[in-house]
């Protein structure tokens, strides 16, 4: 269930100025439509989907690192890095895996080949640490050393999006066939030692645990809620189901939220309605909220609107021992039949609609985990930057006079800081993401953030963002 309000939570003082400037593009240009660029969660690598391939670029050198090719017969639309599972150490690279979603109806699981992976990735780690390693800089890029180790089949039409849960245990895929599939990694669960990891690192075994078919149209995107304190904190829903929550966006103009109930069944717990066109994507808030409130959710689409959704805070009594299944009469816990449990439905509300900037479909929005800034791109070629602010209304007439989008604040407390028109020339921009900087021009390698846009022109372009 979803309702719409215009409440806002005051935030830190607003920035007065913002500047977005282009950095040298990743090389080489791809010279064909590119769909998305996905940064690795911890290594200085970013994977770009295009044609039948994925090109992995180095964030240290802004050049090609490796290529995944030969596994798909149609365009690769999406990709996701598997988060490290079990013990995390300097040998984390041994479990480097990427999943790709393709228009050929399949998802592919790729592993970096052991023969060259350690040498190449250790080079990236040296560059990441800021060492002035001239020899590393001059090394030739590695040959294509990716191996397609598993193909996930089941969808009847194009796979539009793939996304891992925070633990890496689950993978979600969605398709034009109106379904969302959830897969579980059962090949190497929670390795407890480096020796065990060494023995099992090449095992890839996935099982289908759910096929969700409640959307009435093409499912465009899926996104798992990140593992931030609010996901399990005071304002998290009572334990009538597991911690993982998945959001899906659809051609049917809705967003659906999914959770695993006490019987291990994945169920729809909320339908978010309000968009007047296809919902192209969803993104979760990655920064912890004040008082450990549950993470908010973004949605955007063909109606040129970006919405912010918040979980309605439950009544205090719902957090009692009975609701949590931890004692008392266990009235609503896991130990009673489905028919006797309280409804699994959650109530979400639209707490903000961002100021309108785009004239055309909004294809991608990114939410910074460091600053909380939002950035958006779409079919009009505009790159926009937003900031959350106090619940006031402002308008910067100077921006409007200069032909820029006027700086305004919506009822929900967001304003436009700046825009870049024609960020990829006349071409549509399909994707935007925040990621860490490791290149030579960075003043704080591994800490400073930049934006990366991916467009129909085949250019993967980084952008420096300066806020004052």
Swiss-Prot record:
WD repeats lie at residues 71-122, 154-193, 214-268, 274-319, 357-396, 423-468. Residues 193-204 have a biased composition (Acidic residues). The keyword Endoplasmic reticulum does not apply. GO terms for cellular component: cytosolic [4Fe-4S] assembly targeting complex. It holds the Pfam family WD40. Essential component of the cytosolic iron-sulfur (Fe/S) protein assembly machinery. Required for the maturation of extramitochondrial Fe/S proteins. HAMAP family: ciao1 (MF_03037). This is Probable cytosolic iron-sulfur protein assembly protein 1. It comes from Neurospora crassa (strain ATCC 24698 / 74-OR23-1A / CBS 708.71 / DSM 1257 / FGSC 987).
